[in-house]
């Protein structure tokens, strides 16, 4: 049961964050790599509207604030798809896309397929995804359930679950609280065998730059679908 709970938690919080293949997956899902990092160069891709006349990618040193340090024009290689290959080791840098149409220049965006962002999610981050994988990640599989009627489900909000001063947990209100043995033990004592986790992706309503200010939201205002919510991390300024 412990393994079932842990794997259910991982599936609920992390399943969307580390897929890197561009081919069709075994479950029929399609993935898209917006950013592919290497020490020699980083490849960027963006699916932009057909009315786009040009797309630029802006590189920043900071996840928030500061001026852009480089701008690169992207090339249209297929219908609605734009690419750019930026030379050099960009790990630790941040980026945004900016689309131009015949009528106007759009606001900068991290892109809907960003997997890591700076504080408050306005800029995407260049990271090495392989470095973020915990041991055994590639072999992880979701637990099998014979029938949905066998499920005893507990609904969990990351912050609410562990934020109480009496919780006895070290990482109160954080993702890491669910890795603490006491947290898993508590869930087991409830008699549940599945966890329904409320939104874990990056949402807009909590200011991640103010971690010491009490803030709360259920999370149904998504900002970056494929990025973990920064306010649940131990340091939202470190994308990896």
Where are these regions (language model features)?
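Bacterial Sec-dependent N-terminal signal peptides
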Residues: 1-21
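The feature marks proteins involved in alpha-glucan
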Residues: 17-43, 73-155, 160-173
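Conserved, mostly hydrophobic/aromatic
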Residues: 46, 97, 156, 197, ...
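Short proline/glycine-enriched turn/loop motifs at strand-loop junctions of beta-rich domains
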Residues: 47-54, 157
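A conserved hydrophobic secondary-structure block that centers on an alpha-helix together
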Residues: 159-195
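Aromatic- and acidic-residue-enriched carbohydrate-binding clefts of CAZyme catalytic domains
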Residues: 167-177, 207-240
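Carboxylate/His-rich catalytic cores and anion/metal-binding grooves
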Residues: 187-212
